[in-house]
């Protein structure tokens, strides 16, 4: 069983909050993680079960009853949002920590029937698909070490083909163990089930084909800049509808929006966001890309590797709220794939290069940013599929992709 990095965060949150919401995409491992927690006394329910769901909806206050010292674990809380008000009533009468652990595959802020946010009573923990560091049982401190310019040595090798293979196989625990054909079928069923069943918890879908088209377009545009109006024109769907569907897909944790870094006073800084799929395997399998086709096609390889690096950086950043991920682009076509900002304002720039050959040209945007926009300390790294960490001037390093897993 793979140990999840967020296990300690969930346990810590249960000691601090009356209610904890463990949230993330379907099949990323929330229920498994909840079952691994060393809780003294628990009562568990899953709202995916129809009879359980009916019972919860018919008598929410009775359903959430608990004994002293007991943690009630409720899976897929978005299926019976009526329970949230009942839980609020219970915890307002009892300040004990760790009373309820609610897992969910939808962001409760976007669930249609939610009328109370449980603000001040609830702690939220995001779980993502398996990161490289979890698979390789790493320490999960890559970002911290990158800020310190203390890069790991003796890293298990990971060449371009190996990295693409990991990305295409995905970090979904069930899918990653399948062969390629079974995995593609799994992802098609996965996406269909989300759109047909789970989407109804978030928004009203009048045209399923339109929602499916928007999801396909977002996968195709994953890790690329685009305008919503452009997507609306190409898909033949109204702009407002596209915006509604994108919000719903984000609410189900199928996509993340990475906003632009805009804290400089340079007038040409771009203001467009990028969208990344929750997992690079979702992109490759739904779009029908084989590992060989990704390896042989630079555009596909770049897209998949950037998405894969994002999901790994995001898993690392989730471990500590002092980190925030953004991206940079300006009207002069200078681009930095990711800017990681620490709460004290110190910046880490991250570029992604699928290949193993690189040179000074690969650092030009990082060095320009450091000279013209970074107000204080700045470290720039290029993640590549080579074996060694190489220095390209003060504060600039080529770092093996495999370091993400240390």
Label every PLM stretch briefly.
Residues 1-13:
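Pre-Walker A adenine-sensing motif
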Residues 22:
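Hydrophobic anchor at the beta1->P-loop junction of P-loop NTPases
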Residues 30-31:
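Conserved lysine of the Walker
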Residues 42-71:
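Short glycine-rich substrate-engagement loop in P-loop NTPases that contacts/grips substrate
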Residues 84-102, 106-108, 115-117:
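Conserved catalytic/switch belt of AAA+ P-loop NTPases
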Residues 112-225:
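Interdomain motor-coupling "hinge/lid" segment immediately C-terminal to the ATP-binding subdomain
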Residues 176-347:
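Accessory nucleic acid-recognition modules appended to NTPase machines
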Residues 385-406:
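Domain-level recognition of nuclease-like catalytic cores that cleave nucleotide substrates
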